[in-house]
Regions:
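Active-site histidine-anchored catalytic micro-motif
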Residues: 1-162
Length: 164
């Protein structure tokens, strides 16, 4: 069975509503319990590396994410990064250029709805991300709105629709 590394960075997918809007709400281990079939794809290790609204991500955050992948690279067959949708495309692009000689899938995933909301896209997107991360594909990919695309070409078109 493949071994996948799940890096959580924040975003709507892992949030819950509060009186002041969305706030960090779930660790990757808690989300894994909410979508237990993800374990069918691979053995999954979870790392909660930051809890940021993706609109606040800076270049040093991309360096931190890339560094985490480089540090754990030999231990895993693929990587899934849960992320906010506002800058998901920028993170994909940064990782594409920062991770030289990449020979594994790195999948950056977001959702427009929190994982606990009814009719959420989060669970579908997580399944697509782990399927891609456990595949033989190589490169950085984006998953959002039920689509899997090469991360370098991802862009967010609309703030309120469930796609990238």
């Amino acid at each position: 069975m493949k071994k996948i590394c799940w890096l959580a960075t924040g975003g709507t997918i892992a949030s819950r509503p509060s009186e002041n809007g969305l706030v960090p709400g779930f660790t990757p281990k808690e989300m894994l319990e909410m979508v237990p079939n993800l374990k069918d794809y691979a053995h999954i290790d979870c790392y909660d590396i930051m809890q940021l609204d993706s609109t606040n991500l800076q270049p040093e955050d991309w360096q931190y994410i890339a560094g985490y992948i480089e540090k754990l690279y030999e231990q895993y067959d693929g990587f899934v990064i849960t992320h906010g949708t506002d800058t998901l495309n920028w993170t994909c692009c940064a990782l594409h250029y920062m991770l030289e000689n990449l020979a594994k899938p790195v999948v950056v995933i977001g959702s427009q709805l929190t994982i606990e909301e009814e009719n959420t896209d989060a669970k579908f997107n997580l399944n697509a991300a782990f399927a891609m991360a456990s595949s033989e594909k190589i490169g950085v990919f984006a998953v959002c709105g039920g689509q899997i695309i090469e991360g370098l070409w991802a862009k967010k078109l609309y703030l309120s629709l469930i796609h990238i």
